[in-house]
């Protein structure tokens, strides 16, 4: 069985014991198109928003209730302080860069801007650099694709972008997080939504994989998580992730990216 899975503390034992044929991919998100376009893997790590889009377009996968990566995305939105002050609520009419419109981090950040800062997402000029993982998805009219060779960080420094979503904003220089206190903002988001975290990557299996096999794989994943000390940012189980998943579904649905609000149970059916 071909598999895609990153190297994390919670996956270490699983990768040693599962007997799956793991792809030699150091950064799993670089292979997500191979998951949802080419159907190359029976078992795969996949970003939650990519999974929800894949489901909306009839891709043959079901979710396993295992969070392999998660973080609060409030600290990923950055701006260039050398170009003057800027606040999250001032982004209407501005250019905001992101790797791809539909990726999970960008989707979470747009949700934060809309819900917590009152930003009208249709009035922001989104600037993207890559195609979506799910081929059928179409960026909205207020999104523009940059030609190959353009660099998001360089454009932010040059003033070609007013803000940008960066995987890791630099700790020095003029680039700073646009949300002034990301940790406090994350706590406020938790209180507002009732979710414990913002899911990034979970695990999916093809519909062709039997329930018995997927149950066995999930049990081994749970054993692997236990061996890693049951880290709280890697919750396993449907009930343990119910509110986390509902928050993700709400976020992407409110942006009009999926046709309806799925129930949590549907994701595992």
Report each predicted region and the residues it spans.
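Conserved C-terminal helix/tail region of periplasmic/extracytoplasmic solute-binding proteins
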Residues: 198-200, 257-269
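Secondary-structure end/capping motifs
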Residues: 204, 209-259
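Alpha-helix C-terminal capping/helix-coil junction sites
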Residues: 55, 156-160, 249, 253
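Short helix-initiation/N-cap motifs at beta->coil->alpha
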Residues: 23-37, 86, 124-157, 240, ...
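Short, glycine-/small- and polar/acidic-enriched structural segments
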Residues: 2, 7-119, 126-133
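Pocket-lining segment of extracytoplasmic ligand-binding domains
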Residues: 141-228
């Amino acid at each position: 069985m071909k598999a895609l899975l990153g190297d994390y503390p919670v996956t270490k034992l699983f990768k040693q014991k599962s007997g799956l044929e793991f792809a030699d991919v150091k950064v799993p998100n670089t292979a997500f198109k191979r998951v949802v376009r080419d159907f190359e893997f029976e078992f795969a790590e996949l970003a939650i928003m990519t999974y929800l889009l894949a489901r909306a377009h009839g891709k043959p996968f079901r979710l396993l209730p295992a969070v392999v990566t998660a973080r609060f995305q409030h600290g990923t939105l950055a701006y260039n302080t050398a170009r003057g002050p800027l606040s999250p609520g001032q982004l209407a009419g501005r250019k905001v860069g992101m790797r791809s419109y539909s990726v999970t981090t960008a989707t979470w950040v747009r949700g934060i801007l809309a819900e917590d800062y009152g930003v009208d997402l249709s009035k922001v000029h989104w600037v993207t650099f890559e195609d979506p993982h799910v081929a059928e998805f179409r960026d909205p009219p207020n999104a523009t694709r940059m030609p190959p060779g353009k660099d998001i960080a360089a454009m932010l420094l040059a003033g070609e972008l007013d803000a940008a979503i960066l995987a890791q904003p630099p700790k020095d220089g003029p680039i700073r997080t646009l949300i002034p206190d990301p940790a406090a903002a994350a706590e406020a988001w938790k209180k507002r939504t009732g979710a414990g975290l913002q899911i990034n990557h979970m695990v999916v299996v093809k519909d062709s994989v039997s329930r018995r096999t997927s149950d066995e794989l999930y049990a081994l994943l749970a054993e692997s998580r236990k061996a890693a000390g049951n880290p709280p940012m890697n919750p396993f189980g449907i009930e343990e992730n119910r509110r986390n998943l509902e928050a993700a579904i709400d976020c992407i649905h409110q942006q009009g990216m999926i046709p309806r609000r799925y129930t949590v149970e549907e994701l595992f059916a």
